[in-house]
Structures are given as C-alpha cells and as structure tokens.
C-alpha cells in the first residue's frame, strides 16, 4: 500500500494551476501599531480582492509584520471565501441592487455595452476581478475601503439570475425574457 507524501510535486503543481486563474487587486494597506511595554510594535494590514473574471470573486484581510506577508495572507483568505455572481452576457449585472455594510451604502446598476466600469476606488477593484465590463456604481455614506468592499459584496450576493426568478414565479424563462424586452430593459445584442 503506497501512500503519497503530503506535499507532493503534483499537488503543488495543481495548486499553482488553480491559483493562476485568479486575478488579485490590492485595495488598501494600513500600518497598524500594537502598544507593548517597550513602546509600539508596527505591522501592516492588507485588504485584497481576488477573482477569476468569469463571475467568481472574494475579498480577504491579512495582517503581518511585513507588507508582502500581509498581502499573501489576505490573498489566501480571499481565495477561501469566493462567491459566484451571475452576469448578463458575461459583462454586466442582471438587475439594479443596493448593498449596505455599517455606514457604507452602494447602488449598483446594470449598464449598456460600451459604458465601462463607472465606479470609484474599492468598488472598481471588485468589478475588475469579477469580470464585469459595464456597470454604474454609486457609494454613499462611509468611504472606508473595508465598508465599501463589504457593502459591494452584500449587493452582489443579492444578484439573482432570471432563470431562478422564473422558476420561483412558475413561469418559463422565455416568457420572462419577452416581458423584459417589452419593457425596454433588454440587453443590447
């Protein structure tokens, strides 16, 4: 009975291939201090957003004494907590949605092809790693990057694919699409 070693080369290569599909963006880095008996001990905290640009995205927070280590920890944390967001035509959101975390509020609106990413700071990083090409976003309240990212994720978690809505209402997907086209909210093809 042959047992494979825990950290085998194949395992490492598979992990590297899996990690290579992700794009990561550094959103914020802070210098933090821990007060100890002899004075202050400085460290760094990093906020990173990771995504595959195909609808999966996550964010992570890492703290360490050195910047690269804090970024590495944040990236690993983000890869552990990925969410899937359904995209319309692989480029925008299906519907407008609000999100909130603490005092940070965001409004995300789907947009026509060619609009681009109209969003500020931390929200832009989320959309770029998610794979959204056309979106209009507005943030109000707190401008703290942590609150803005969490509020954006709150909004993205409320995105629902029209097929799921059709199933809940007991309708056919084609019927729902026809209603959407009739109301003028159809995607530009």
UniProtKB/Swiss-Prot annotation:
Domain S5 DRBM intervals: 22-85
Signal peptide: none
InterPro entries, sorted: Ribosomal_Su5_D2-typ_SF, Ribosomal_uS5, Ribosomal_uS5_bac-type, Ribosomal_uS5_C, Ribosomal_uS5_N, Ribosomal_uS5_N_CS, Ribsml_uS5_D2-typ_fold_subgr
Superkingdom, natural source: Bacteria
This protein's GO CC annotations: small ribosomal subunit
GO biological process: translation
Keywords: Ribonucleoprotein, Ribosomal protein, RNA-binding, rRNA-binding
GO molecular function ontology, one term from the record: rRNA binding
Function: With S4 and S12 plays an important role in translational accuracy. Located at the back of the 30S subunit body where it stabilizes the conformation of the head with respect to the body.
Domain notes: The N-terminal domain interacts with the head of the 30S subunit; the C-terminal domain interacts with the body and contacts protein S4. The interaction surface between S4 and S5 is involved in control of translational fidelity.
Record-stated family: Belongs to the universal ribosomal protein uS5 family.
Assembly description: Part of the 30S ribosomal subunit. Contacts proteins S4 and S8.
Protein's UniProt name: Small ribosomal subunit protein uS5
Provenance organism: Agrobacterium fabrum (strain C58 / ATCC 33970) (Agrobacterium tumefaciens (strain C58))
Lineage, top ranks: Bacteria, Pseudomonadati, Pseudomonadota, Alphaproteobacteria, Hyphomicrobiales
